[in-house]
UniProtKB/Swiss-Prot annotation:
CDD domains: BRcat_RBR_HHARI-like, Rcat_RBR_HHARI-like, RING-HC_RBR_HHARI. Its EC number is 2.3.2.31. The active site is at 329. Zn(2+) 5 binds at residues 316, 319, 334, 339. It comes from Xenopus laevis. Keywords: Cytoplasm, Metal-binding, Nucleus, Repeat, Transferase, Ubl conjugation pathway, Zinc, Zinc-finger. This is E3 ubiquitin-protein ligase arih1. Zn(2+) 1 binds at residues 158, 161, 180, 183. It catalyses: [E2 ubiquitin-conjugating enzyme]-S-ubiquitinyl-L-cysteine + [acceptor protein]-L-lysine = [E2 ubiquitin-conjugating enzyme]-L-cysteine + [acceptor protein]-N(6)-ubiquitinyl-L-lysine.
């Protein structure tokens, strides 16, 4: 835009937002901060839904006591992330002294790496730098503006909608291309909302790659939700490029976790979500991120469909079309019109040499036939193995979902128990039991991912014994919590629940300590999928 004076990214509760579409380009321009957007018409409830409520920071460890006390982190709001971004821009601008919007574009080009930007900025070739970043050198703006000044006396046609407007209704970037306010607004809204573009929106003129600065976007967009979407896209770039920051993966949560160093550690967001900072998945102890990624991919893609096809069908030995046997006869005829090969289902050899052996193949010792059968058996064994671990993984996942619903039932039971002369403190054992139950379910779920890739050795046998013991105790605890509690059985069930959840807690700790000891001593060997 024509002027960047007075533009800054700071929050200012006193500042008013100017939304007049035909305002002079030298008037005060909007800031990128959320406070200004709220003043522009975003209600408190809308803002809470988009940005998350609350402020300040939460330091680990979080609930449950599982987190490493030495792994410190903060949970930041979108506003606090914006302030971090502002501070980064300010630090760079103290040296290069460019308009804030230009500096933001330069930093985005270098993935918010201040050192790389500084190095390139002072290597003596500024024109090449600004060209690569798709912005006009700020030192040449005044000359460009003079070359592109129009006569204000005549109506001019917009080059997008071809309607005539006074010159005052046109605006543009430093490249000199000007369009009417309405076309600008619709163009920017489409780019932001429909295409999800933020930092890479270019001038709408054909062949022009100059990027639209933040001032222009915030001045020409009137919908406060579009502005917040744009702000989120810009801050998302800042977060994604910073290895110490990670968005909370929970749906509709706009908090960011900031750590002192990146690692595969559990972190708790203010929304209640616990996740692995390294990979962003739900916390998945004892399996490492690498193997969990492979497992998720294996479950999501069509690899197991391929396994089923390999286990239940065979390829025609001539044209390699997949064939499923639908009768008892071993004499197979390929249905491919261009093939029509006849072969034996058992050995996959040509049918003609079989003579009259219609239901009995006597060619088991031929190398090619044996190799085909061996491959078939391996595929079947691999499929059965995958289904074994997948079924147990999914079973614990489903049970975990049911157990989360237990909290409501437990709350009701706690209220009933308080009516039978038990204090609030005395009934807290039920909530503690559900907490432990959910932790055990989660751990057991991921032990099956760990076991799927684990090679058999003496340590794996110990692991499987620990897993079986924890699994059995978890099922017993789950059964206790689902029972109806009467006055007569109150004390008995309380003792059983307390004993069992303490045992589960202890066995879970033993299992995890053993797995981590194996990591430290390099005891585990893996099956490459």
């Amino acid at each position: 835009m024509d002027s960047d004076e007075g533009y800054n990214y700071e929050f200012d509760d006193e500042e008013e937002c100017s939304e007049e579409s035909g305002a002079d380009e030298h008037e005060d321009e909007l800031e990128l901060g959320e406070v200004e957007l709220v003043e522009a018409g975003l209600s408190g409830s809308e803002r809470a839904g988009l940005c998350g409520e609350g402020g300040g920071s939460a330091l680990g460890p979080g609930p449950g006591g599982e987190e490493d006390e030495d792994y410190r982190y903060e949970v930041l709001t979108a506003e606090q992330i914006l302030q971090h971004m502002v501070e980064c821009i300010r630090e760079v601008n103290e040296v290069i002294q460019n308009p804030a919007t230009i500096t933001r574009i330069l930093l985005s080009h270098f993935n918010w790496d201040k050192e790389k930007l500084m190095e390139r900025y002072f290597d003596g070739n500024l024109e090449k730098l600004f060209s690569e970043c798709h912005v006009i050198n700020p030192s040449k703006k005044s000359r460009t503006r003079q070359m592109n000044t129009r006569s204000s006396a005549l109506d001019m046609p917009c080059q997008i909608c071809y309607l005539n407007y006074p010159n005052s209704y046109f605006t543009g970037l430093e490249c000199g291309h000007k369009f009417c306010m309405q076309c600008w607004g619709e163009y920017l809204t489409t780019k932001i909302i429909e295409e999800g573009m933020g930092q890479t929106i270019s001038c709408p003129a054909h062949g022009c790659d100059i990027l639209v600065d933040d001032n222009t976007v915030m001045r020409l967009i009137t919908d406060s939700k579009v502005k917040l979407k744009y702000q989120h896209l810009i801050t998302n770039s800042f977060v994604e490029c910073n290895r110490l920051l990670k968005w909370c993966p929970a749906p509709d949560c706009h908090h960011v976790v900031k750590v002192q160093y990146p690692d595969a550690k559990p972190v708790h967001c203010k929304c209640g979500r616990q996740f692995c900072f390294n990979c962003g998945e739900n916390w998945h102890d004892p399996v490492k991120c690498k193997w969990l990624r492979k497992w998720i991919k294996k479950c999501d893609d069509d690899s197991e469909t391929s396994n089923w096809i390999a286990a239940n069908t065979k390829e025609c030995p001539k044209c390699h079309v997949t064939i499923e046997k639908d009768g008892g006869c071993n004499h197979m005829v390929c249905r491919n019109q261009n093939c029509k090969a006849e072969f034996c289902w058992v050995c996959l050899g040509p049918w003609e040499p079989h003579g009259s052996a219609w239901y009995n193949c006597n060619r088991y010792n031929e190398d090619d036939a044996k190799a085909a059968r061996d491959a078939q058996e391996r595929s079947r064994a691999a499929l059965q193995r995958y289904l074994f671990y997948c079924n147990r993984y999914m079973n614990h996942m489903q049970s975990l979902r049911f157990e989360h619903k237990l909290y409501a039932q437990v709350k009701q039971k706690m209220e009933e128990m308080q009516q039978h002369n038990m204090s609030w403190i005395e009934v807290q054992f039920l909530k503690k039991a559900v907490d432990v139950l959910c932790q055990c379910r989660s751990t057991l779920m991921y032990t099956y991912v760990f076991a799927f890739y684990l090679k058999k050795n003496n340590q794996s046998i110990i692991f499987e014994n620990n897993q079986a013991d924890l699994e059995n105790a978890t099922e017993v605890l789950s059964g206790y919590l689902e029972r109806d509690i009467s006055q007569d059985s109150l004390q008995d069930i309380k003792q059983k629940v307390q004993d069992k959840y303490r045992y589960c807690e202890s066995r879970r700790r033993v299992l995890l300590l053993h797995v981590h000891e194996g990591y430290e001593k390099d005891l585990w060997e893996y099956i490459e999928d």
